[in-house]
Amino acid sequence: MDQGLSTGAHQDTDGLRERNTRVDSTVGREALTAVGEGEIKDKDGKASKTFGRTPDGTVFTVPQTHDMVSQLLLPSEPKNFGDLVVLILLAGHIMFLWALPAGAKIPIFAVTYLFWRLAYNAGIGWLLHNQSHHKTLIRWAEKTKVFVNPATGENPHPKLYNWIKRELETKIPQDYSFDNAPIEYNTWLVFRRLVDLILMCDFTSYCLFAIACGHQPVDESILMTVLRWSAGIVLVLFNLWVKLDAHRVVKDYAWYWGDFFYLIDQELTFDGVFEMAPHPMYSVGYAGYYGISLMAASYKVLFISIIAHAAQFAFLVLVENPHIDKTYNPPPPRKRSSTCADSSSTLPTDLDTPTAPTPSEDQTPNATYSYSVKPPQPVHNLLGLHNLDLYRTTDSSIMLVQLLVFSITALTPSTPWYQLLFVVLAAISRIWYSVGIGYILRNQSNTKSWTRHFVKYGDTPQEAWNQWKGTYHLSMILCYSSFIAAVWKMYTFPADWGYGLVLFRHVLGAGLISLQIWTSVSIYESLGEFGWFYGDFFFDDSPKLTYNGIYRFLNNPERVLGLAGVWGAVLITSSGAVTFLALLSHILSLAFIQFVERPHMQKLYGRSLRQDAGLVKSLKRSLPPSLKQLHGSVDKMFDDSFEFIEEMLDNARPKLAAGVNTFVKDTTALFQKYPARVTIARIDADLAGFDVRDYALSVEGTSALSFEESEKNKGREGANARMPLDRRGDLKDLTFEYGSPIRVKWTAPLHHSKKDWIGLYRVTDNTSREVTRVSSQGRWVATNEGAYDNLTCEKGILTSDVVIPSSERQGQDPCEFASGEIVFAGDKLFWTQGVFELRYHHNGMHNVMAISRPFEIRIRRSDEDETISDGDSFVESAVENALLPVVRNCFDRDPEIAPETVDEQFGTLVERDGKFAKRVVFAVHQMFGIELAAEVVKADGNVRNLAWRICNAKKVLAPYSMSRSNGTTTPLEESKE
């Protein structure tokens, strides 16, 4: 329903803090969506047709439809049986509220509302998730043949067919034919009726619950009552406008998740509410819930509103966003070079992405130093718990600082002196974070002082950038840690939560804190690590502004929303000291934007800066002319004030600089003078008539060097065991390459169940040979298509039910049998080494009908002696040749991402989905004993760079290796001549 990512159908090219982010070549949901069945006027002013396109390419005319409220409540709209059912249910809810005793109304309607909310977010969410991934609703319609004309004799439900046809054609009298419409569109129309029922009951039960909880608080003044009702009505009206405007923009097509079923051949501009906020249907579109909570004056309504809102965000994150990314943001097609030479000529030359230097370069001590002004590849990010690395000085320092701050906070009493101490510490940390960091960035912008300092001592700009990131990150953590400590010291646990507005203040404060956290996450998602740490102050690399994420709607989200949490702390503590800290933080943040960010952005991007963001544009359009003029006067006043302050600071800068230089010199001299150092087995009951001897599995794959072949002649076995076994025919070892597809041939009786399936397991997973008791964890493939409401289980089916004549059935009863082939690849494999088997299961259950021969998945470990040549120089070509087939297997041999040559770049999906890089990391560790991070594989970008990195890592670690190539493991005294 929400089209949050569709709001930027046309993007501006100007703005403030969108810092030179990498531009994604893919398009958002706005490229092919929205507004399907709305009337679109052509150049002659006539209504033009809207065309839909099904996944199989069928093009059809999308008729115009109307929203559910109009269809239900307007007498002019045609009604059908489904409308009557919805109206009767709504009337039943109202009568139920009237009939219940006073003490039972609140709990019963709370349960009723939660039921409908669960049906919305969990029920509809489950249907949409499966429709997106497996086309489940379409497959149900195809299986039941409910949309097939009974005249063909194939529809087993002719009465149901006629009833659905009458219902749908009654609602859509024009441009619609039930018999001619594609099955996707008819399925969507039926799905709409279910959505209408759930949404109407959801909203009605919520309003009735609010009525049941509504009351007049004791001793509430008339003024407070008027303010409460006025604010509530304003929020409800705003919510109503958001819904109506959103429906005006996206129409029924997006309102009812039409793109889960088909797409619209149309690209339109999104405006109105979609310029104001991200995902307006799920964010500001729930403002009315809080307005109703105010009018009801009930914390019960408020808390259930928060639960509903949180469930809606979960629906967005788990259902809608994955579908949006899959449908509208696929990875761009990879750029293939015509020749290897062309490919090699475009290799990156960044420091963090080496290009296999020549031996002469490699022997030069400083050959790897590069003073490139290009930003380094993001390999080892700082932000996020998943990036925490205690081996890194910055991370360990941050952990120690936080441990120290919070330990002192917890172990000291909350006396006035300690409270003052923590408030002063928080104020100093904030001043350093805004003023100190701002001073460094301003000088970096003007004179590159930070980078020059490191270059002066022989370091690279990349080293300066890394040191800056650590400094900024530590300053930010110290600022917020000290603020939290000060808030904790000033906070007093309420003696009575029901007194006055205590509970309301805590709820609102927690909401503001959550808003700041969400804003920070959104900013980081939009800017990335490079923009978060102000990378364009350090690297001037073809600056180009892009506006995505939260920056579509706000130029500087950190100006207001980014500090909502500090004001939330003010509400929770009701402390003057915390209010002072919040005010100080806000003033310093605004000054930082005005005196540091804005001048740099104007210098870097010039006239391309955007004056008004989407939210401001929407508000300006709705303002009367007099208020627009007032807005311009206020802006001029603020600009004049900031110019005066800036001139004053410019005049005072020489004196301040002289004082700071004197202080630094004195301090440096002082330090130089005084240095200081269950699994449930589902047994099928209909096994009668099936003989397990009629089932068989055979396995084929890309052979690899077996363990026995690689370890023979080591002299560890007894004399009789040193000769290799004579393995021929069916006794030959099955050892396959890591990640290579496994082809399975199966045979079964002709009357075998169409729901049979084959799963992949470790040999040690199951002790029983008759029943599988361990989950396959998605590593299974159905033997026949269409047997399951799941597309994933059909990936890998090559052939099914190929009849094999009895003449080919040697040594068994002469009768025909069915056979087929499937392939296990990609996510259906175990991405590790070990011994595995395949199991054929009966009728969707876990009864085992056949088990394949065990086979081994193995990665051959590289012999160091084979990869070392004269002068202890690793032969990179050997490493490249060993890596290339493994990397191709790790990338599922997908031509869009798997390289054909060592110079060809990896596909963009490798950067999006971390599983591919992690597979390569495991293989490299097993082959060469080198442990790399997944980010390194992404940054290297091709096999040649990865091989170069492995060879250099081997050289660095060679002195610590225990291999024979590095001499004896225990140094011996050289014999004297």
Curated annotation (Swiss-Prot):
GO terms for biological process: methylation; phosphatidylcholine biosynthetic process. Pfam families: PEMT. Residues 1-23, 328-370 are annotated as: Disordered. Keywords: Endoplasmic reticulum, Lipid biosynthesis, Lipid metabolism, Membrane, Methyltransferase, Phospholipid biosynthesis, Phospholipid metabolism, S-adenosyl-L-methionine, Transferase, Transmembrane, Transmembrane helix. It comes from the Eukaryota. Coiled coil: none annotated. The chain crosses the membrane at residues 84-104, 108-128, 194-214, 222-242, 276-296, 299-319, 398-418, 420-440, 470-492, 507-527, 576-596. It catalyses: a 1,2-diacyl-sn-glycero-3-phosphoethanolamine + S-adenosyl-L-methionine = a 1,2-diacyl-sn-glycero-3-phospho-N-methylethanolamine + S-adenosyl-L-homocysteine + H(+). One of its GO terms (cellular component) is endoplasmic reticulum membrane. Its EC number is 2.1.1.17. This is Phosphatidylethanolamine N-methyltransferase. Residues 105-107, 215-221, 297-298, 419, 493-506, 597-977 are cytoplasmic. Residues 1-10, 361-370 have a biased composition (Polar residues). It comes from Penicillium rubens (strain ATCC 28089 / DSM 1075 / NRRL 1951 / Wisconsin 54-1255). Residues 11-22 have a biased composition (Basic and acidic residues). It is found in: Endoplasmic reticulum membrane. It is a multi-pass membrane protein. Belongs to the class VI-like SAM-binding methyltransferase superfamily. CHO2 family. Catalyzes the first step of the methylation pathway of phosphatidylcholine biosynthesis, the SAM-dependent methylation of phosphatidylethanolamine (PE) to phosphatidylmonomethylethanolamine (PMME).
